[in-house]
Amino acid sequence: MSDILTDTSAGVLTITLNRVDKKNSITAAMYASMAEALVQAEADPAVHAVVFQGHETIFSAGNDIGDFLNAKPSTMDSPVFRFLRGISTFSKPVLAAVCGPAVGIGTTLLFHCDLVYAGDNAAFSMPFVNLGLCPEAASSYLAPQRMGYGRAAEALLLGEPFLAEAALEMGLVSRIVPPSEAAALAQRQAQKLAAKPLGSLVETKRLMKLGQVEVVAQRMVQEAQSFGRMLAEPAAREAFTAFMEKRKPDFSKI
């Protein structure tokens, strides 16, 4: 079965991360599938909204480290960057149902969602610094904007996780429900959107995001440049080696 499932029904495209045995860690092939699904949904006038979902126990553990190291994103045409451009510029409403851990891009993609519904077991983290890297998905801009600088610093500089209640308080999450209800709630809200005039949805979203579109695009490029450079530096090499060897990284001599 595919690691990415797509289903279009009654004006809603649902994209499901379907690699639970690997904690929904995302491979380049999965990014490519999601990027293509967004391209098709953007062009399809019958699609009024998109929902991202995982499993009741896990949203995503972030990048699949082994796959990532074997096929490091080297250009802005890499699948991960095509996906990020696709979700950040998507003109129609994007929703997410998030339960369990949402690590790295599992959290940063949510900054590009219009409505996020979390299970009460959701836990969010952006541990890029812990891996000797820097933020991606324009999260270095969007996290301080959404969370406030202090909380963003805890999340990005310290890499500290935060739970659903904190995410609700800072506005990253729209509502918290039991994990068994999150996907259904996201679908109900998406169906409400699908019943509304598409032109009004698109124009309202455009106006709400007016002023940040170019900044987000520029920041993604800047982050990608830094990310690519840092991947080749000693801190990242130590972090990934430690991960593969199942030990804590030692940055004391770097």
Predicted regions and their residues:
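Conserved CoA-thioester-binding segment of acyl-CoA-metabolizing enzymes
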Residues: 1-55, 85
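Charged catalytic carboxylate motif
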Residues: 29, 33, 79, 86, ...
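Crotonase-fold acyl-CoA enzyme core
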Residues: 88-201, 228, 233, 238-241, ...
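Short, charged, surface-exposed hinge/linker loops at domain edges
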Residues: 205-214
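Short beta-strand->loop
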Residues: 214-219, 253
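Terminal peptide-recognition signature
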Residues: 15, 19, 34, 52, ...
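Glycine- (often His-adjacent) and acidic-residue-rich active-site loop
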Residues: 32, 39, 46, 54-89, ...
